[in-house]
Amino acid sequence: MLDDYYTWTYPDIPENVAQELLQLNGSLVVVGVVGRSDCDLANKMLAFGMEPPDDHTPEDGQIQCYYKPGTFSLLLHFESTYDAEISGQMIDVCIEDVDTPFDIDSFFERIRCRFVRMMLLALHVCHIVVWAKFAREQHLMQFLPQMLRETPAARISERTRLCAPRILFLFENFPGDEPKTRESVSTCEFQMEDCIYELLRRYNIVTNSSSNSLVALPNNKQFVFFNAHEELRDDKLLKAIDCLNETMYKPDLKEEEEDLEILAMAPFDGFVKPFTMPVYEKEWENLQYQEDHTVWNFLQRHVHDALVGCFDAGSFKQHAQQGPFQLLNSREWHDCMATMHKLLVENAKDPDHETSNEEYKLFLKNFDEDLNYEKKFWAHLCELGLKKGIAAYKNAAPANYGTATHRQLLADATLAFEEEGRGPQAQAALAKLAAICHKHWEDGRQQCEQLSLRSHPCTLPKNMPHEKHNSGVIHISTCNCGRTQGRREDPFNLRQANYEFYEHIAQMCNLCVKVKQYQFPIFEPSVSDYRAAAFEAAFPLLNTGKSGAPQDEDAGEDEAEEEEGQERELPTKKQLQNTASNCCSHPLSPTFGSDLNMSIAGFGASLKESQARSEQLSNSEQNTTRSGSSSVDTENELVVELQEPAKKEAREDVGPTDAVSTSTTEYLPGLVHTVSNFDLLPLFPSWSLACVGPSSIYSHNTGLQEHFQSGFLSGANFLLPWDVQLRLVHALKQQYQHHHHGKKQQRWKKQGDRLSLKIFVGMEYECSRGHRFMMCAPDRVLRGGADIERDTCSKVVHNNMPLYYPCPCRSQKNFLAQLMRIHVVTPKAPVNIIVDPKVCVGRYTFTLGSILPPRLSQSAYWIIRLPYVYQGDDVLIAPPDQLDPDYPLAGGYLLPGMFGVVETDPTLDLNEPGMMGASAAGNFTRI
């Protein structure tokens, strides 16, 4: 027993308290206290002067009972989720569950449902409910009377409750800006009663009939209480400060002694005190009002109404019939309480609870859903938004569209959904919207979306068969000779990009059918079931295991590698036999780029071929070096040592120099580069080399005319002149036989065997709109004849030329132009120009694919067309989306040193097909 009352946790009632409650017989009034609290013990009984034990732990659904001896009321304190301590416990549990994200809407639904269950219990087992919130489910009447019929709770009549409980409202705090007088407090209470009564009547919570009312209100009695005079939860810090001030206050003792002396001189007590009897009476009335204005007295007035039997009579005006009001003894009430607690609270916590009453089963199942009206409201809004979003997507969707269009349509549908959809179910509704739109897209409206070599998706339907892809993107490109421009579809394979288009447009060009084409070596099958080469054979750059063996490997592995290296050296030895008898100034490396200081890691057998050939040609290089530096006057001259021409019969016996054993069953699937195997050839040529006419068709005064080369921008249609100083050095035997030379060669001898070659070179770039222009430097577009200086061409041929450069055409979109052609006008001289272009893209260096570079005929206009698309070993090398000004060579570049010069072979007819690469073209001097 605490102070003057008993307290226990239901249903553990102490035996002595049970005996006292039995002595009350039928005079026990049950008062339920339900509401909110913000203290650690979740105590709402502090206004009644009652507290739980010190070891009490608040829990959801727990009922703490209070009884004061000598009274007729049993107080039930319902601890619910509306208590701050219990809701804090639930929040802690949710936060500790890391697998489930915390959702405030779902959390609020749970605490409200649990509170309403406790409220339902209070409304059925209490006569008076203090500070309650109303949410009684009326359909409890469909099953509760039947289920209570065979239980001890059958005594509480067919209305399944003791009475229509009288609802009282307790406000623990009085407004601080109002005076705490009797008139002010009463005014606040009356105003609040009017507001509450109007609200409850409007929503039919209180009616004129007790059987149809959820709760009852007293007719002529106060049912709102403001705690204005008692500080329930005082600030402990402020209280400690006040105590400290009282302790530190020291009154003046001398002043008190003087007061006592004055009072001693008075003739009678009270002689010097003023007569203020009205003030004392008013203060006494206020003190008396403060003593009487307590929650306990307020509650006892309503308890008295219940004891005398006028509980409902004062609550309902129009119906005078006796309502279902019952007073039970403690044992009967306890049995009734146990039954109601089990039906309304305990069974709801058990999801596996079985019952034969269908109405009760539906109540347990649908209680949370019926109560969460906000959830229904949000669901309705999301349903409206979902319909609006689906309609927006379907109305804007074309017949066929790709992923980018689908994403844009889905984004627009999401915006349409958000105009209506709200609440915690919006994310699930958006996921459903995305699934419906995705299904609509895949239902015969999805595009193929196979990416082209220019990274454009195919626009044809995915579920319909089509022979070839089509992205709908059209480019303007020029033919091999540069005369005719045409529209080309976006290519989807290497053959379309580098071969088929140029073959197709050549049939429409009246110049392409007449020009002399260089025949690049291609694959010639000997069987019908030829195939692409195996990955390791076709792409040795990726076969890093053959670049070198560790020193601690087994001897068997070393022998296998040696045998494999010997097999790869066989075609190289045949080639060395054809070139060993000839001397050259700067021989072309058989690895197509080993003389460019490239990395030799992973080159495999090609590196061995390069080393073997370098050893055999070292003597000729030393001789050439001595001859090229013999005189100081010839520092700016290129020295070409004239060799003794071989006889035609001897050449036929030796055979062509580029005769290398190639595979006739396997082909190279990509472009030829510096480390691809020599015995593998591509199915089609990706390069083009054509002689479009004599050198006289180009005039440096007018540049390239539109009728000859179409699509050039104004001022960017000039070739760059290149003056090359050359000196011929005769072989020993030829010095005694120059009387056998022709007249033209004798004329060159008279000029001292020194030649000044006039070569015209142009690096042509072309964008996807068909605009063509020349470059006069790696970072400068040719703007006219004023940009051409004496050393302008040297900037082009002796520097890395970028593979991509921004097109100078005026357009909102910055188009990238690609290096597509190299124009060469050869001079009239007893020498031939050799071309050996190498394009470096990423880690690959692409070449023409010929063992020996082609030689160009004299006094002719030649055009080298570069590949439209570059493909490496394992992946397509796509052009960059935009060019970084700080790194213009990041997309690729043309290596310098692609031109060479070699003496003219009078026994070789370059007009014959396939002879431009024949003879000793591998022995030439690089310019």
UniProtKB/Swiss-Prot annotation:
It comes from the Eukaryota. GO terms for biological process: nuclear-transcribed mRNA catabolic process, nonsense-mediated decay. Residues 613-633 have a biased composition (Polar residues). Residues 543-581, 611-636, 643-662 are annotated as: Disordered. InterPro entries: SMG8-like (IPR019354). Keywords: Nonsense-mediated mRNA decay. Residues 551-566 have a biased composition (Acidic residues). Residues 644-654 have a biased composition (Basic and acidic residues). Involved in nonsense-mediated decay (NMD) of mRNAs containing premature stop codons. Probable component of kinase complex containing nonC and recruited to stalled ribosomes. Belongs to the SMG8 family. This is Nonsense-mediated mRNA decay factor SMG8.
